[in-house]
Amino acid sequence: MLMRLLSLLTLSLVVSGCNQAAPVAQTSENSDIYVVNCVTFEEKPVELVLYCADAGQILNEITWSSWTPTEATGVGTSTANDCEPSCAEGKDVISAVEIKLTKPVTSESGKRVFSNIEIQYDKVQPSGVMDEVLDLPTDVFN
């Protein structure tokens, strides 16, 4: 009796599997383009250090809405030192940001990297700006 039940169960599983479509491969937005984050090449980083020497400004909590071979866009938070009265004693200024990476180039390491970042802040920054365009490093520091 048990053998007959197991046989029927196995048969029903085989037959039910025949009516299902083959799984479709998931497509990825992996575009083999990176941004240099001080000492690493990264795709879609959640955190991006803009000034590697002192980490005076960091973009964090980044959510990327688009990441293509020519451009990447996202939103996040900027944490920047106001350097008042000095950078050692400064306080962090936190702002919501919109980020756009552009101008892909080939690094000396042979990787495609974004070489430009556009940042729009939700409030005036310690530097006095609300919009900023910066050149990014195109190779990692060793």
What are these regions (language model features)?
Residues C18-A21:
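Bacterial signal peptide processing site
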Residues E89-N142:
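Helix-rich interaction surfaces within compact, conserved domain-sized segments
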Residues V36, S66-P69, N116, K123:
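Intrinsically disordered, low-complexity regions enriched in small/polar residues
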Residues V49-E108:
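Mature extracytoplasmic domains of secretory-pathway proteins
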Residues P23-C52:
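N-terminal export/targeting and maturation segments
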Residues M1-S16:
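Sec-dependent bacterial lipoprotein signal peptides
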